[in-house]
Amino acid sequence: MQRRAFLAGGIALAATPAISGTLTVDGGTITIDLRGDPPPGFAMLAENWVRKSAAAVALYYGRFPVPELAVRLIVGQDGGVHGGQTFPGDVPAIRIRVGGRSDPADLLVKDWVMVHEMVHLAFPWLDLQHNWMAEGLAVYVESIARVQAGHIRPQQAWGDFVKMMPRGLPHDGDGGFEATLSHGRTYWGGAMFCLLADIRIRQYTDNRLGLQQALRGINAVRDFRRQWDFEETLAIGDRATGTHALRDQYMEMKDQPVTPDLDALWHGLGVMARDGGIAFDRNARLAAVREAIETPVS
């Protein structure tokens, strides 16, 4: 989750850290500050958590998205991860609330929040009108990046999409993405936009390129340190793939509500609900597209 009214948060971030350390991941230097009352051994667990998450994001984008990052962990007395925020600036900052009683599985296996917040770093800081893209992109890329890094199985990511993306469909009276700012439309509607764009790019390029290459092209010249024009940013992504996929889809969906047939989409991708889980049909029409989305790019 991004913060646009971040002055108060910036004041909180300036508090004296309890423990701090630095690590480097694929071109990025990350400072980790622990605040609160972290128990013995928690600093090492936190470092492993940040490093593993950063490596997944770097794998997806080809490098870590920004040269410097400050990670502030507010350590409480419980367990688990309780949400995060990403702040723009010359040195972007991520603030996450986490329980000091978290075990390695909580942070290294179950958590998705750290990767989600780091994905924000690879795209320009956007105004509220385009928050659906910022959050939807983080939802979508976080899932695919974790699959490509081997953190989760593809069945988990696609199962989440099948279960949650219907929340992103427009309701009666809704407008396009720029007019309806509900939680479901912002997070899961935005993620649906990204999946559809990924498929569209791959259809335009005979499955040679996808959204991942478009986003790498954007991150090569822009990132979360600055606010940039949204349509210009999409044009950069389109140039990276030699298509107009992002622009065309944005123009189709920004003002008018569009209701894709998700059941037909899953069928085409070969994603099938079976026995309480997800199975894949490798003979489906778009099965090769789904497999390409899941596969790391060199």
Predicted feature locations:
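Beta/coil-rich, acidic/histidine-enriched accessory regions frequently appended to metallopeptidases
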Residues: 51, 224-298
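Structured segments of extracytoplasmic/periplasmic soluble domains
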Residues: 56-63, 121, 141-148, 196, ...
